[in-house]
Amino acid sequence: MKKHRYSATNIKQADWKQIGVRTAGERVVLGVDVAKDEFFGVLMGEDLAVSATLKWKHPEQTRALGAHLIEEVHADRLEVAMEPSGTYGDALYRHLSELGIPIYRVSPKRVHDAAEVYDGVPSLHDAKSAYIIARLHRDGGSSLWEAIPEQRRNRKALIAELDLYQDQQQRNLNRLEALLNRHWPEAVRVMELKRVSLLCVLAEYGDPATITAHSEAAWELMRHSGRGLLSAETIEQLLACAQDTLGVPCTAGERHLLRVLAEELLRTHRQIKRIEAQIDQEVHQDALLTRLAAVTGKTTSLVLEAALGSPLDYPNPHSYLKAMGLNLKERSSGKHKGQLKITKRGPGIVRKYQYFTALRWLY
């Protein structure tokens, strides 16, 4: 098996005149290994010969790379193949696409699995990864990288914003629960921690002693914030346990912290409600999402469309299932022989919301 050398030259020092001669009249692919700062690329011809192994600083030298590719690579057709490595390659994708260069994507899993295929060495590093990407593209292991439509990008951003606030909410609920179990343990037994009425009274007064000192105002605040859904008996029970709590009395700083946590939870609650209203509107205006929502729920239907695109774009239901990472794989040998497990490939957020859908069906 042929060994390869993977030493790379910065695009500033590369002999572009010689590269132009080597690539003239050929169909050339630039395989790109994407990183945070230093990108690597391999220019490969139709005969699989490497014209150059390059490296450049991104984004400082990315425009210069594009200029070299357009002006000094004299190929009949130039293509670029790269991994969809999170968001790090998106700016390069945009720049080269605007220059009219077709971009292809190669699965990171394929690159990983091919580590030993071409040189017999089971290692991966930047320049070698770029070579493997170019080679896989030559072998038909890539697909055209199509730009995501603006509407879908907006929906992905909306779901990411919802996930951000839900994560903040859960973290702060955990913090608040820990503090209340120290200072007012009875409260979390009387009411759910994320009830707006409880959060409102905590945001206003902070600790049970201050709530007791302003019991009449606290009663009115809870009745108003509960919007008629909170019974007088529950309010009386909460105020009674505030007066007779076993909790540790708060210092001024601890009382302030309780107020801050409650205020932050109320803020995230409002933001989540705002986003959920936007999701309702998005689903209502889209006939396909409306049909999906009847089965999965509105938020899950939007998650599926944002993460995977329209189910109508898939050739069959199994392909859609595979994109979710919910298709089954079976071990044919070893400790787990015969066991079926889901592959868990694709966006994890899809499986998270599909899990919620399954729970909704069960309960």
Which positions does each model-derived feature cover?
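A detector of single, family-specific signature residues
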Residues: 1-363
